[in-house]
């Protein structure tokens, strides 16, 4: 098993953990569809910056 050479100080531990913080995702509203989406990503409808860039197939819903 690995054994540390010396004890890690609280300052060192904090410096190591300083990059572990979680941030909220940046959201935008598409000007065409009004849909909320992540910045710099295509919406679920296939729009990006107000233009249709991907043709989305219609989802199939099975009815019982």
Curated annotation (Swiss-Prot):
Give me the segments passing through the membrane: none
> Keywords on this record?
Ribonucleoprotein, Ribosomal protein
Query: Which residues lie within the region annotated Disordered?
Result: 1-28
The record's annotation in Pfam families points to: Ribosomal_L32p
Q: Which SUPFAM superfamilies match?
A: Zn-binding ribosomal proteins
GO CC, sorted alphabetically, is: large ribosomal subunit
GO biological process: one example: translation
InterPro entries per record: Ribosomal_bL32 (IPR002677), Ribosomal_bL32_bact (IPR044957), Ribosomal_zn-bd (IPR011332)
Named from the GO MF annotations, one term is: structural constituent of ribosome
Family, per the entry?
Answer: Belongs to the bacterial ribosomal protein bL32 family.
PANTHER family from the UniProt entry:
50S RIBOSOMAL PROTEIN L32, LARGE RIBOSOMAL SUBUNIT PROTEIN BL32
Question: What is the name listed in the Swiss-Prot or TrEMBL entry for this protein?
Answer: Large ribosomal subunit protein bL32
Question: What is the organism field in this record?
Answer: Xylella fastidiosa (strain 9a5c)
